[in-house]
Regions:
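Bacterial N-terminal signal peptides
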Residues: 9-20
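An acidic-aromatic substrate-binding cleft motif
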Residues: 190-273, 277-299
Length: 542
């Protein structure tokens, strides 16, 4: 059987089978490897592979899962460690480049709404989603003493316990093959498996090509913002005092500057537009080099009475170098900000998939004008598009930011909230009665509070990791386009994610597309000598 670090696909990751197969046959605990796009059920039958082969660019995260199974005897005092990776010419990727998490299962007590279409929820049950880190993300020191700890752990009879492994390939790594090992220790014995990594001859940009804006309501500390950015997702707003650090170390490239007009889906009223000088003062306080935007109104496509006020807001912010972002379908009434320049009153149109499909003509019109279009996701709005709720297949999270966004020329992504936690978020992801009588497990909570695991800020969910991998897929396509191979790049992208309806549900197909992109870029970069992404590889606008 063969896997990659992100999905099941032939010829990429080959596992040794002898150790785990023998263990299962004897009814003793087993260890095996699973790809990152595979959810390991609490009682799934054990797999059979123990060795890992990965391929990745510099500056890229690549992930896999180390799974322990208690079989008929259980497993106690389990820990997992990873060695340095040794590479060409004495090069070393230190073990500190790996981040490990114990996956915590959460219970979905009732299914997300099921529209009976091509993309249906998987229903009630226990899902691995929350990630308990082994080490502090800032200091790298082991965590201990919190109410939830990663290691050591026990595995009950017949149950599984996966460990999520992130490898961040250093931006300074030389291309070539690197090898090392992981070791699982327990009271019942130890197992060591091999890790092989091929570092491709190109580097992902520190600031992702795909813009994003994900909102914190209560947990937006600097530590929380850095955790989001580590996962290639940008917070909505940032403090000007923190921006230099976030730009240098975490790839921040855009920020919302405020203010909000007060208009949203339930309120067709806007406050008067701030003056040009007010917008200029706000803009001047931000760090140079950031794309500045104002998320001025939310879901107001039904509020035609607001169009004159929207134009005034846009005209004033445009004179201050700020872009206007509104979640609504394009409408010709807002194709001008009233200045006579031809610039639209909305620079960044943010659409749900169903909104996009219902306004394709208008989307083409605003893109032709030079506006940009982003996507967003919430609840269950249709029967066909990707969903970001816990009981949907992992492919849902990866396909939207990556291949669908590239195929539809979308340049950004928005999510309304990442920290809408119930009173006990580590043990309850359900919310029936909050948005409707239905349950939308995990809606508005892509991160978990850090206090319970002993870290500042927040910790990621597996869903956030899959979104991150999609953002990296977007970069792969963007880099290949920048190397003069746009037709090939788009052909590969559209083979798996052509639009909101016809995207693949096959994790192996996604990994095959990524592998083809990576190998092609690696060959082109090796032939032409440069080792970083070509200039001009960013999408226009944003």
């Amino acid at each position: 059987m063969t896997f990659s670090g992100k999905a099941l696909v032939p010829t990429i990751l080959v596992f040794s089978t002898a150790l785990s197969t023998l263990a299962v046959a004897q009814g003793t605990p087993a260890v095996w490897i699973a790809p990152s796009l595979h959810r390991v059920g609490m009682s799934d039958a054990p797999g059979s592979g123990t060795d890992v082969n990965l391929s990745a660019a510099r500056g890229e995260y690549e992930s896999f899962q180390i799974v322990t199974n208690g079989a008929s005897k259980g497993l106690g005092n389990v820990n997992v460690t990873i060695s340095d990776l040794q590479g060409p010419g004495g090069q070393v990727i230190p073990h500190s480049s790996f981040t490990l998490y114990r996956e915590k299962y959460v219970q979905v007590n009732s299914s997300s709404p099921n529209w009976k279409g091509p993309n249906q929820p998987m229903g009630p049950g226990w899902y691995p989603d929350a990630l308990i880190p082994f080490t502090d993300p800032d200091s790298g020191k082991p965590l201990a003493g919190a109410s939830l700890t990663a290691v050591p752990f026990d595995v009950k009879t017949g149950k599984n316990q996966p460990v999520w492994v992130d490898l961040l390939v250093p931006r300074s790594a030389e291309p070539g093959k690197y090898t090392g090992t992981y070791t699982v220790t327990s009271n019942q014995g130890n197992l060591t498996g091999s890790i092989s990594l091929k570092v491709w001859n190109f580097t992902l940009p520190l600031a992702p090509s795909l813009k994003s804006s994900f909102l914190f309501f209560q947990a937006g500390s600097l530590a929380a913002q850095r955790e989001l950015l580590r996962n290639k997702i940008s917070p909505l707003s940032t403090s000007p005092a923190d921006q230099p650090l976030l730009m240098k170390e975490n790839g921040l490239s855009a920020t919302h500057i405020g203010p909000f007009s007060g208009a949203d889906i339930g309120r067709c009223n806007m406050s008067p537009a701030p003056s040009v000088n007010q917008f200029k003062a706000i803009a001047a306080a931000q760090q140079p080099g950031l794309m500045l935007y104002d998320y001025s109104a939310d879901e107001i496509g039904h509020c035609s009475n607001l169009y004159p006020t929207i134009r005034q807001w846009a005209n004033n912010m445009h004179q201050a170098g700020i872009k206007n972002l509104i979640s609504m379908s394009p409408t010709p009434a807002l194709y001008s900000d009233g200045s006579g320049s031809g610039r639209s009153a909305v620079d960044i149109w943010v659409l749900l998939p169903v909104m996009y499909n219902n306004s394709k003509k208008q989307v083409d019109e605003v893109m032709t004008k030079g506006d940009t279009v982003w996507s967003y996701n919430t609840l269950v709005q249709d029967a066909y598009s990707p969903k970001w709720l816990i009981d949907f297949d992992p492919v849902n999270f990866r396909i939207q930011p990556g291949f669908i966004s590239q195929s539809l020329k979308l340049t950004g992504m928005l999510y309304w909230r990442v920290d809408k936690w119930p009173s006990d978020p580590w043990n309850n992801v359900n919310n029936g009665g909050t948005y409707s009588s239905s349950n939308y497990p995990g809606e508005g909570m892509l991160v978990y509070p850090g206090q319970q695991v002993g870290v500042k800020g927040v910790v990621a969910s597996m869903r956030l990791k899959w979104l991150r991998d999609g953002v990296e897929d977007y970069d792969y396509v963007q880099i290949l386009k920048g190397l003069g191979k746009e037709d090939l790049a788009m052909q590969i992208s559209r083979s798996v994610g052509p639009d909101w309806t016809n995207w693949t549900r096959d994790a192996g197909a996604i990994e095959s597309a990524r592998q083809k992109l990576g190998e092609t870029i690696d060959q082109l970069m090796t032939t032409s000598a440069p080792t970083t992404a070509p200039s001009g590889s960013r999408p226009s606008g944003n």
